[in-house]
């Protein structure tokens, strides 16, 4: 197994795991419910599937709650639908930038001889993997 193969296998497995998590999560859209400062909840915000609901990240006494509104907004921005859309786009990029005899099929377009094109994995594939947590240590 080459380093290129290892990176692509790792990336596809990572995308599969993220997709499974997103598909199993509470579907959205998600909304932030901000609590009045000093409320009995002990938290600044909750996250729910409708405005005013907190069925994703509940009140403090329900074992949930976000201590900061910014955390709740971040959670909402990464709801399952958004994650699935990004995964689908990343898979399309990975399919375009595929290995073609050791060169990137997409980046190598325009080269008469493929042996002059960029090596695979190209910068696009390496950056995709980096965005999902790949480090040089993963290659060991």
Go through each PLM region and give its residues.
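Short intrinsically disordered terminal tails
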Residues: 1-10, 27, 99-140
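Generic preference for well-ordered secondary structure
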Residues: 2, 14, 59-62, 67, ...
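Exposed alpha-helical structural elements
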Residues: 6, 10, 14-17, 70-74, ...
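Compositionally biased, intrinsically disordered low-complexity segments enriched
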Residues: 33-37, 61, 99
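Residues in flexible loops and secondary-structure boundaries
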Residues: 38-40, 64, 91, 101-102, ...
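Aromatic-glycine hotspot motif
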Residues: 2-51, 91
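Amphipathic alpha-helical oligomerization segments
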Residues: 17-32, 78-113
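A short, structured beta-strand/loop element
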Residues: 41-82, 88, 106
